[in-house]
From Swiss-Prot:
GO terms for biological process: mRNA export from nucleus; mRNA processing; RNA splicing. Component of the THO subcomplex, which is composed of THOC1, THOC2, THOC3, THOC5, THOC6 and THOC7. The THO subcomplex interacts with DDX39B to form the THO-DDX39B complex which multimerizes into a 28-subunit tetrameric assembly. Component of the transcription/export (TREX) complex at least composed of ALYREF/THOC4, DDX39B, SARNP/CIP29, CHTOP and the THO subcomplex; in the complex interacts with THOC2. TREX seems to have a dynamic structure involving ATP-dependent remodeling. CDD domains: WD40. InterPro entries: G-protein_beta_WD-40_rep, Tex1/THOC3, WD40/YVTN_repeat-like_dom_sf, WD40_repeat_dom_sf, WD40_rpt. This is THO complex subunit 3. Residues 1-22 are annotated as: Disordered. It is found in: Nucleus; Nucleus speckle. WD repeats lie at residues 53-94, 97-137, 139-178, 180-221, 222-261, 264-303. Component of the THO subcomplex of the TREX complex which is thought to couple mRNA transcription, processing and nuclear export, and which specifically associates with spliced mRNA and not with unspliced pre-mRNA. Required for efficient export of polyadenylated RNA and spliced mRNA. The THOC1-THOC2-THOC3 core complex alone is sufficient to bind export factor NXF1-NXT1 and promote ATPase activity of DDX39B. Disulfide bonds: none annotated.
Length: 351
């Protein structure tokens, strides 16, 4: 099926129309009051603490909608859930059952007790923190690497290594639809309005489908190389994509134009997260820092130092706390640092 191609994104300065750089893109004159205020806050809250979570590297972290819990998924085939208590994470439970690595997980958008995990064992599992049990195991056709829950809570989409995306009814746990794509599917996401479905792909494109019809709406040439991750801001104004070209591009949801780029990272952008107010964007890669930018200007607000590549970042849904996980070294390389920790930045320096 032919998909209308839009003009290039960050690479085509000066053009206008869907999928192009907006003409009002400009360099800001100096730090905004928001940036100065947040920098002041982080000067007193720049502490990062590590919390043991798994026996192998952590691939994914995510907060429940109420911010009370953080879940992590790991190469050790388990998920862990922590309770956030003041300035620390307290491990509540470890969730076993998958037969292979847990590559991605996400929470129900409005029920803080349910989360879902995607695994290479060709299943997804829905878990309930109240009973600490798996309430559903759904068999899928391939090794699952991407998962997201629709904003209305009714559907779970899961993508596998064969570029098949399956849409699963969150109540009946049955497959509602399945799409095989002819390109490498990376991250997947609904828009906040639940009426469009976005995929980032290996050709640097963002593919947009109508939902629930799953008919192609547009294909945006967003980056010259592999488009890896995508996130929507909680306010519904923007979405951001991260690419193998080390750029993060910010897009206007309604106009589908690229508003600005963030270019402080040197390595492929693996993971993104917007803060709860939509004003900060964290992005991370194999660089040994996480970039925190002000969304409206692209200005650097802060950087969080880390000793190894970062796999996953997630802002807390109510507070300026950033959870993340890195490629921790196993004991045989460096016995002082454990594999499988979850990290929390934004804690008071005196905590």
């Amino acid at each position: 099926m032919a998909i209308p191609q839009a003009s290039m994104g960050p690479s085509s300065l000066g053009q206008s129309g869907p999928g192009s750089m907006a003409p009002w893109c400009s360099v800001s004159s100096g730090p905004t009051r928001y940036v100065l205020g947040m920098q002041e806050l982080f000067r007193g809250h720049s502490k990062t603490r590590e919390f043991p979570a798994h026996s192998a590297k952590v691939h994914s972290v995510a907060w429940s909608c109420d911010g009370r819990r953080l879940a992590s998924g790991s190469f050790d085939k388990t998920a862990s859930v922590f309770l956030l208590e003041k300035d620390r994470l307290v491990k509540e439970n470890n969730y076993r059952g998958h037969g292979d690595s847990v590559d991605q997980l996400c929470w129900h958008p409005s029920n803080p007790d349910l989360f879902v995990t995607a695994s290479g064992d060709k299943t997804i599992r829905i878990w309930d923190v109240r009973t600490t049990k798996c309430i559903a195991t759904v068999n899928t056709k391939g090794e699952n690497i991407n998962i997201c829950w629709s904003p209305d809570g009714q559907t779970i989409a899961v993508g596998n290594k064969d570029d098949v995306v399956t849409f699963i009814d969150a109540k009946t746990h049955r497959s509602k639809a399945e799409e095989q794509f002819k390109f490498e599917v990376n991250e997947i996401s609904w828009n906040n309005d639940n009426n469009m479905f976005f995929l980032t792909n290996g050709n640097g494109c963002i593919n947009i489908l109508s939902y629930p019809e799953l008919k192609p709406v547009q294909s945006i040439n967003a980056h010259p190389s592999n488009c890896i991750c995508i996130k929507f801001d909680p306010m519904g104004k923007y979405f951001a994509t991260g690419s193998a070209d080390a750029l993060v591009s910010l897009w206007d949801v309604d106009e589908l134009v690229c508003v600005r780029c963030f270019s402080r990272l040197d390595w492929p952008v693996r993971t993104l997260s917007f803060s709860h107010d939509g004003k900060m964007l964290a992005s991370a890669s194999e660089d040994h820092f996480i970039d925190i930018a002000e969304v409206e200007t692209g200005d650097k607000l802060w950087e969080v130092q880390c000793e190894s590549p970062t796999f996953t970042v997630a802002w807390h849904p109510k507070r300026p706390l950033l959870a993340f996980a890195c490629d921790d070294k196993d004991g045989k390389y460096d016995s002082s640092r454990e594999a499988g920790t979850v990290k929390l930045f934004g804690l008071p320096n005196d905590s």
